[in-house]
Amino acid sequence: MQQKFGGRLGHALSFLRHDGGHFAQFVWSRFQHDRLTVTAGYLAYVTLLSLVPMIAVVFGMMSAFPVFQTLKQAMEQFVYHNFVPTAGEMLKEYIDGFVANATNTTAVGIGALIVVALMLISAIDKNLNYIWRSTQGRPLAQAFAMYWMILTLGPVLIGGSIAISSYIFSLRLFGAESLFGIGYLLLRSLPFLFSVLTFLLVYTVVPNCKVRLVHAFIGALVAATLFELAKRGFAIYITNFPSYQAIYGALATIPVLFVWVYLSWLVVLLGAETTACLGEYEKPVSEELA
């Protein structure tokens, strides 16, 4: 299995080195044809509407596992610091207030929160499957099971990964005396590695068709790299050109959040398009290697 994956990965990288220009043009033409800039705007809008319900549901799922109660704060700090540039603290304050209000609702309100959260996952599912030209819909029971699995297992997997990371970093290997050695490098690379893993899971689980693991891995690498570049570039812009604060005042967090969510979805969709295009562009060779 590892030999097969390594062979396919090596072939794919060799193919990209020799025909990377044509492949980039192919991806860009598909990106424009699929109007992914419009799709990113739609998903950003749906995400902002569903953000509080999704977080409320996720934290509700985590509360069912007492071991994750102590990790909630660590998860929040990790996510806001590494995935929401510059506005993390202010955004955390607002979202905590919204979630506190949402979790005090009745059973009907909680049901509505779950429905809205599922609607977000459904929108992601439909738009990503359009990129893969997958027109065959999932049966309702299968779709609901997949959505519910994401809502329930997602917090468990994230909490588990952070728990493992916390345990590793507590070892003597990552003490102060080795902070500038291998421990420091691994600590700095954790956001990138988590991004690669997240994109890899999305590009393999969400499409309602067969996706080669090597293609999903390359797409995840592309998306994770672009995500890190976008995060740093956006943080530099927000820090050095704070004119948006003079324009929007106390509401400045809203456009900042919307633009960042929009850029994030552009990255996700471009990585998905890269993964799908690898399957189309390399189809004859893939059939030979099968």
From Swiss-Prot:
Gene Ontology, cellular component aspect: plasma membrane
Record family assignment: Belongs to the UPF0761 family.
Subcellular location, principal: membrane
Alphabetic keyword roster: Cell inner membrane, Cell membrane, Membrane, Transmembrane, Transmembrane helix
Transmembrane intervals: 48-68, 104-124, 144-164, 182-202, 216-236, 250-270
Cell location: Cell inner membrane
Mode of membrane association: Multi-pass membrane protein
Organism superkingdom: Bacteria
Classification via NCBIfam families: PRK01637.1, yihY_not_rbn
InterPro entries: UPF0761_bac (IPR023679), Virul_fac_BrkB (IPR017039)
Any Pfam family the entry gives: Virul_fac_BrkB
Protein name: UPF0761 membrane protein ASA_4118
